[in-house]
Amino acid sequence: MLETRWHLIRHAPVDNPEGRIYGSSDKSANTSNANAFQLLAQRLPREGIAITSHLKRTQQTLDALISGGLEVSQQIIENRLGEQDFGDWTGKTYEEVRSLFGDAYDKFWITPAKEKPPNGENFIQVIDRVRECILDCTKKFKGRDVICISHGGVIRAALTIALKIEAERALSISVDNLSTTIIDYLHPCENFAGTWRVRCTNVPAI
């Protein structure tokens, strides 16, 4: 049975001592922990297809993995795998958002998958673009290993697809920096319609 394997890795940590919402803003990753990248690189398949988002923290993470020994056959940048856009909340602390947006902030946390920050996007929209990208790439790279360095929201979105769960439930799944989540697509064959399988979630680099 032919499988396409997705190794979903959340980017390296972002230095953010004030706890500001950075979402789709282009923050740098802290890639100083060389040991973590070396250990993670050893566990990943060789000659896989590497896909990052357009945000530099994912590309910096891939560069650090390659420096740690990872070998990839191709590198692709995919805008559809960017983190959720929190609109007017971006760059603010949660306390600042609560003070400035009041009722809208409170309403957001009642149904966080469906509510949209002002001038941003909701998690449902993230799922839609991630689904489109994953299905396209699964077809294009059929039977290959895909090493996807992206974001917490993107990985949760991928799990809604693989597990067929509601968006709200996916938001309760932990996705730590440099953790690995592996999902496989088992391609259709005679008397088999094809399905997703989850191998593991949130496996730490160290």
Model-assigned labels for residue ranges:
Residues 1-5, 84-99, 139-144, 160-206:
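Acidic, low-complexity terminal tails and accessory targeting/binding regions
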Residues 6, 48, 144-150:
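Generic beta-sheet signal
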Residues 15, 57-59, 83-84, 154-156:
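Short, active-site-adjacent cap segments at secondary-structure transitions
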Residues 52-53, 128, 149-150:
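Short beta-strand scaffold positions
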